[in-house]
């Protein structure tokens, strides 16, 4: 992309950048908005991409519904059980208590990504000044804008030398676990000395759940080396 001027430039074509572009265009269809996207133009390569579960609040669903960007498949959370390892007591939150359709939702990353791309293409038809630019590492050369939104998950090569992060000494294992006699639409969250452990609903039915297990990098690396039986034993301990 050569030198150009925009009201808003959004850097990053993932779910955050796509949603930001769609909402801005919905409210200001005549605005000069540019989306810089490192993903391919065609959706084909994205269909088999990241299938990890992403937890979204019910408020996020309401917002995404306004731009017709909610995936056709999701796993709803109706109850959340919260506890702390080694401590007595628990907290139980329900959708009935809060008078909500759901407390949250689990969607696959690829599903929300593809749905947002489709929604943005529809909005693009009535937005004459919108530029959706699929870029390479060496582009764009120069852009002027009133506002720049950084929605890029990674770093550009030109940013590698900049101290732009902080090491919190945390990592997480993300995957699926098979369970028995699970209550449908229930999520569990347990706080441990190393960080939170969450077990969440999935698209695959009540017996297959999403797992997010936070811990130190050393602990996470060790858990990755365990056999399935050893991993489950550690998870249940």
Name these PLM-found stretches:
Residues 17-18:
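N-terminal Rossmann-fold NAD(P) dinucleotide-binding loop
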Residues 9, 32-34, 81, 210:
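A structural signal for isolated positions on well-ordered beta-strands in alpha/beta enzyme cores
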Residues 46-85:
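N-terminal FAD cofactor-binding segment of flavoenzymes
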Residues 2-14, 34:
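Beta1/beta-strand and adjacent pyrophosphate-binding region of the FAD-binding site
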Residues 147-237:
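Conserved FAD-binding catalytic core of PHBH/FMO-like flavoproteins
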Residues 11, 23-50:
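Glycine-rich FAD pyrophosphate-binding loop
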């Amino acid at each position: 992309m050569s030198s150009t001027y925009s009201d808003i430039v959004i850097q990053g074509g993932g779910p955050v950048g796509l949603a930001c572009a769609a909402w801005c265009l919905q409210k200001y269809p005549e605005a000069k908005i540019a989306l810089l996207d490192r993903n391919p133009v065609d959706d084909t390569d994205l269909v088999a991409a990241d299938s990890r579960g992403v937890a979204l609040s019910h408020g996020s669903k309401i917002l995404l519904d306004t731009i017709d960007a909610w995936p056709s498949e999701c796993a709803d959370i109706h109850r959340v059980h919260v506890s702390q390892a080694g401590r007595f007591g628990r907290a139980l939150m329900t959708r009935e208590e809060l008078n909500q359709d759901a407390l949250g939702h689990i969607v696959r990353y690829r599903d929300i990504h593809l749905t947002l791309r489709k929604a943005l293409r529809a909005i693009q038809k009535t937005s004459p000044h919108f530029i959706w630019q699929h870029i390479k590492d060496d582009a764009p050369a120069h852009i002027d804008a009133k506002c720049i939104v950084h929605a890029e998950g990674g770093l550009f090569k030109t940013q590698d030398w900049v101290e732009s992060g902080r090491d919190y000494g945390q990592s997480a294992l993300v995957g699926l676990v098979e369970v028995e006699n699970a209550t449908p639409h229930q999520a569990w969250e347990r706080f441990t000395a190393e960080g939170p452990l969450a077990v969440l609903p999935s698209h695959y039915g009540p017996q297959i759940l999403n797992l997010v297990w936070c811990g130190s990098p050393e602990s996470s690396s060790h858990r990755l080396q365990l056999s399935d039986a050893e991993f489950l034993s550690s998870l249940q301990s």
